[in-house]
């Protein structure tokens, strides 16, 4: 850098991702679903999970005068499960799009099939237990590839909901979840299942962390008057609402999944 170049912004990857989605204030939620998955929300009161299943730390706009704390839920076994299935189970399919299409043939709940997706090491949300990945309820007479693929996506969604309940217990309202249009959020099954299980609206945006950091740096040097101006051009490209008429089916599948998890932990 040339001498005199202003350094006006710094942040970790998940606070920066939240910023890129214009998540600054209490009740606003950001999410990612790559190799691992994250749900990140903002609180305006000092709180923490006594079992340390989620992390609490200062958000990018926290000040002594205005408390803004980020609460981070991380699920290690997210997209890596989908990737493992692609390379070891669905080898005849050429893309994740093909996997999603096959999974869409299976009904909500995957005909009673449940997957515990924690095969990427110990999970903080489980108090650092390493449960490994497991499949429950498989029936050789009724289940097929599509059921397994759908159950995997539902398993990740259910893991998010399990963790978001911890965040709710800390006083966080989860009504809208913002995410970039990437990774597992490209799957309509994943998006719709997450919206319906959590009873939250999902908003997808055309952005990424690099763009968010550039906007933040602009705010830091005064190029933008405030965050409202900085994010005025942020493009919302899709909105996914919960399927209220089918929510009972999603919740029944979640409860079955949670019962299997309780048996393990």
Labelled PLM ranges:
Residues 1-178, 183-265:
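Active-site core segments that coordinate phosphate-bearing ligands/cofactors
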């Amino acid at each position: 850098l040339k001498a005199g170049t202003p350094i006006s912004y710094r942040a970790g990857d998940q606070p920066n991702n939240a910023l890129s989605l214009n998540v600054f204030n209490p009740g606003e939620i950001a999410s990612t679903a790559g190799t691992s998955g994250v749900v990140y929300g903002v609180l305006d009161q000092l709180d923490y999970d006594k079992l340390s299943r989620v992390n609490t730390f200062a958000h990018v706009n926290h000040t002594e005068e205005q408390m803004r704390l980020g609460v981070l839920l991380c699920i290690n076994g997210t997209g890596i499960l989908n990737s493992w299935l692609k390379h070891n189970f669905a080898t005849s399919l050429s893309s994740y799009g093909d996997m999603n299409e096959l999974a869409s043939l299976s009904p909500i709940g995957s005909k009673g099939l449940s997957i515990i997706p924690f095969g990427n090491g110990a999970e903080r949300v489980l108090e650092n237990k390493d449960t490994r990945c497991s499949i429950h309820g498989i029936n050789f007479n009724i289940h097929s590839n599509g059921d397994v693929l759908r159950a995997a996506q539902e398993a990740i969604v259910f893991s998010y909901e399990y963790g978001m309940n911890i965040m709710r217990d800390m006083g966080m309202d989860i009504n809208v979840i913002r995410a970039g249009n990437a990774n597992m959020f490209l799957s309509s099954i994943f998006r719709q299942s997450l919206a319906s299980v959590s009873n939250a609206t999902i908003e997808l945006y055309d952005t990424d962390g690099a763009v968010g950091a550039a906007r933040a740096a602009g705010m830091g040097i005064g190029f933008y008057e405030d965050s409202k101006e900085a994010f005025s051009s942020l493009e919302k490209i899709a909105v996914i609402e919960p399927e209220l008429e089918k929510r009972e089916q999603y919740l029944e599948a979640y409860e079955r999944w949670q019962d299997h998890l309780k048996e393990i932990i």
